[in-house]
Amino acid sequence: MRNTFGVAGILALAAIAPLAAQQPGKEKDPTKAVAAGALPAGWTMRLDDKDASKNAKFEAMGPGFHITSGGAGIYYRAADAQKDNFTVSANFRQAEKGQHAEAFGLFTGGRDLSDAAKQTYLYFEVRQDGMYYIAHRSGADVHKVVGWTASPAVHKFDDAPNTTNDLAIKVAADSVRFFVNNTEVHAVPRSGMTADESGQAGLRVNHNLSVHVANFAVKAGGK
């Protein structure tokens, strides 16, 4: 079942307070150090500041890419920057079950990404226990749009260790819609934090994960 925002949702979205942390219990799951390699041509990696001393490895593998994270971060290409009305999508496969349920997914509206104090983007993630999450980052603050929510659309790791999840964010003139395996799980209006979705679109992967990404695409049209 998908969730949509009406007038009440718009007001709630505007009133969201910053989160101190995206997920609890990180002190029991220390970030691993990973030996980084050369990035694929055209790609940029931006680790969360708290994980800047822990590297991550992002490499071309087969027809897609593989991310082995130490630190949590985002990955993007300048060529994928968009002005409006577009769709970003990718297929994700978690290669190993994590000790904790860490998240991976997509982001849009990335601007000032090289400046930790000014960076902004909207992101959409899933994790191995069948839940999804949507949030907006502005500088050091993370504003929760949808907290961790169970959805039958998200394939769980325990149900099939080699399962994949197709994710998409569709940015249209009046809404931003979020899809898991071709099922719309949520939608928000183009207002407040989601009024301007121009900028970079790319991938986000949290810490201590091994994730394969296939069929990454950014295309015009958000319907």
Each predicted region: which residue ranges?
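Bacterial N-terminal signal peptides
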Residues: 8-18
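Short carbohydrate-recognition loop motifs
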Residues: 54-74
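Extracellular beta-strand elements of beta-rich domains used
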Residues: 90, 214-218
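Flexible glycan-contacting loops in extracellular carbohydrate-active proteins
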Residues: 188-215
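Short, aromatic/His-centered strand-loop micro-motif at the edge of beta-sheets
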Residues: 140-166
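Carbohydrate-binding surfaces in secreted/extracellular proteins
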Residues: 90, 159-189
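Extracellular carbohydrate-recognition regions
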Residues: 23-52
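Secretory/extracellular carbohydrate-interaction modules
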Residues: 69-141
